[in-house]
Amino acid sequence: MNNPSTTKAPLADYLAHLPLAEEERERLGESASFSELHARLAGAEGAAADAGGDPALASVRARLQLGTPELDDAEMFGVDAQGRTFLKISPPIRRTKVIPEPWRTNILVRGWRRLTGRSNPPKPKRALPRARWQRVGSLRRFILLLLMLAQTSVATYYMKGILPYQGWAFVDLEELAQQSLLDTVQQVLPYVIQFGILALFAILFCWVSAGFWTALMGFWELLTGRDRYRISGSSAGSEPIAADARTAIVMPICNEDVPRVFAGLRATVESMAATGEMERFDFFVLSDTNDPDIAVAEQQAWLELCRETKGFGKIFYRRRRRRVKRKSGNIDDFCRRWGGDYRYMVVMDADSVMSGDCLAKLVRLMEANPEAGIIQTAPKASGMDTLYARMQQFATRVYGPLFTAGLHFWQLGESHYWGHNAIIRMQPFIDHCALAPLPGKGSFAGAILSHDFVEAALMRRAGWGVWIAYDLDGSYEELPPNLLDELKRDRRWCHGNLMNFRLFLVKGMHPVHRAVFLTGVMSYLSAPLWFFFLVLSTALLAVHQLMEPQYFLEPRQLFPIWPQWHPEKAIALFSTTLTLLFLPKLLSVMLIWAKGAKGFGGVIRVTLSMLLEMFFSVLLAPVRMLFHTRFVLAAFLGWSVQWNSPQRDDDATPWSEAIRRHGMQTLLGIAWTLLVAWLNPRFLWWLSPIVGSLILSIPVSVISSRVKLGLRARDEKLFLIPEEYDTPRELRATDEYTYENRWHALKDGFLKAAVDPLLNALACAMGTARHNRAQAIETVRGERIGKAIEKGPEQLDGATRLALLSDPVALSRLHTRVWEEDRDDWLGRWRKAEADDPHAASVPLAQVVPGDAGLLPAAQS
């Protein structure tokens, strides 16, 4: 029993943090204990919960009504079988079976199963009607293959003529067997190195050729505008959307920047509402967050978003307890629970923003193309201010359309899916695109990391088309703010693409998607191939300089075989390679010249921006090469991959971090320079772009991450993009809401969920008590609460925090004990956090009038 004299002070503090009328606050202040206070707050409605020994849980509804009166009008409250109040933060569950097909990646195993009479999984029965675009696509890809092989053959022939040692045909293997090992090495080593150089050159040149022809055809598509197979042309854009064509817009998040995420989502919701089609769309925030502070911030942000947009019953939130299969598992879980309620699903990333017109257009395109399973938009990058991010924004905005249109030209309805800003036909996705873990052990087994390419391949295997709507406006994303954050993202993409290659020979995959798996691997494998090419070139230089040339390769050879050097061929081949690499960029800018460069700063500024971006891309390419080489080796060696969310906000790289990450690259660049200078200083002219970039990697990484330089470049109209010149409404709203959200961002979320009367009510109402009362459960709850009381908020571990946050009964009991026992470690820390927050509402809190903005801690500006 509490002593009334010792209870009055904390009780008055508690009431001061509830938005009450003064008369009501005085009446409740007469309570003799916190149990009585909660009973008075709850009234008769809380009797069931209070009977279970949870006085704070009994008043959850009353406290939430005080802070957010709109919840009652929106009928957001529910009561579970135990009489506990909860918020209807998600629709009723209507479960659908989501059963992944086990992978059989080994063709020998499949053959053995066939021989022994055991069946392999059949190919899905449905097939697309043989449309004209399929024949056209096959013909186009055959032509592309011929162009790549022809171009590579000519270049490789030239490369063979450039290399100095031309006497391989005179090497007699029988003679080699009769001479000493040292003589054999001296005679054969130059030719072995040359063969390696030639093989690597052919692979790399073919890879560059593929990109060149893709960009060239994209240029033609965009210049002429005569793409008869453009999927966005299949809808007029004004057709009414059928009432049963319901669409779920899902946003999977994990430990993200909460103010930015919910700002972008709010801008998207408001844009959707402005179209008048809102009743056919629902929004889902699917959280895999395991940081308790961020999880509480997400809960508050969801409530504020619903209140500001009147989105109760349209915007839903769910946080998973069991985070299996990462993002793909999160989507699977949504499909299993609510997928049957929707015909389509739009997947957004945490940094995505989409206009309502774009979303409605995607649904209309799906309705107009019943054979389409996925339609992918081409998101435009925007919203970043660092110099590095602005250069990347400019590059993707200027050059990206060529490559995206080119991909569409070659692939048509057998195209890419990038995992976000795309619409998916729900039923075939549920039936065919669930991902089983890859069999076996090691780093290339287990849950699939890069799920998007695989889901597109499975959708096409099941007979549905996968399209890119490359000319659809209103789809946006953000890029990493600096080089190191981009490389963190690249590491997990690298591992995921290497894993996906295990599916190359899976039964039923379309050849185009087998090629997609191959290009995904080459996106990263090209880095170590390029590195080894440079190493072999240096080794050949060393052999040429340090070993005595072998002019006579057979006993009765009449004329010597002189090492050859053809600088004119070398220059021609070098020029050709540069043309393939940089002509797409020039064509992109020429297209802008033709269509109007005003949005890019004008003709002069866009041209200067292109030249500066080309210089920086040359400067950063060797740095990326070494990092990607490391990533590939790490994947093959089984080093772990951390799936941390990339930095979404502008962030500068500190010098200490740059030295730690780039220090070895700088030392390698210096050592490589000294070695080549010692061997043959003239060769440094060819190698200087490589070693120079490595030596300068530290200052380039730091300087390019600076916001000040990025803003200055924008003031000078450098790296300008149309979204900055004439900012779309959705992006303006995102910036505005991000600023507002940061102004009153919630900090110390778990501490406030445990102590603050309003946030505790919200956290308890959004949690789910999954089990009935049982002694074992009560024992575990008691241990967790006791541990929290003993350790205090500073020392309590993250796992226990998360467990308490996920259990509303335990969280409400912790709340009760903290206040009843006047725990200074909890209350003192909470009061200090309130005092340190310049945007905290002044106490005592004023009563909230229905229709006002509502009131939650740190929600006042």
From Swiss-Prot:
The chain crosses the membrane at residues 142-162, 188-208, 516-536, 573-593, 600-620, 683-703. SUPFAM superfamilies: Nucleotide-diphospho-sugar transferases. The keyword RNA-binding does not apply. Gene3D superfamilies: Spore Coat Polysaccharide Biosynthesis Protein SpsA, Chain A. Pathway: Glycan metabolism; osmoregulated periplasmic glucan (OPG) biosynthesis. Pfam families: Glycos_transf_2 (PF00535). GO terms for molecular function: hexosyltransferase activity. GO terms for cellular component: plasma membrane. Its EC number is 2.4.1.-. Keywords: Cell inner membrane, Cell membrane, Glycosyltransferase, Membrane, Transferase, Transmembrane, Transmembrane helix. InterPro entries: Glucans_biosynth_gluTrFase_H, Glyco_trans_2-like, Glycosyltr_2/OpgH_subfam, Nucleotide-diphossugar_trans. One of its GO terms (biological process) is glucan biosynthetic process. It is found in: Cell inner membrane. Signal peptide: none annotated. Its main location: membrane. It is a multi-pass membrane protein. Belongs to the glycosyltransferase 2 family. OpgH subfamily. Involved in the biosynthesis of osmoregulated periplasmic glucans (OPGs). This is Glucans biosynthesis glucosyltransferase H. It comes from Pseudomonas aeruginosa (strain UCBPP-PA14). The gene is opgH.
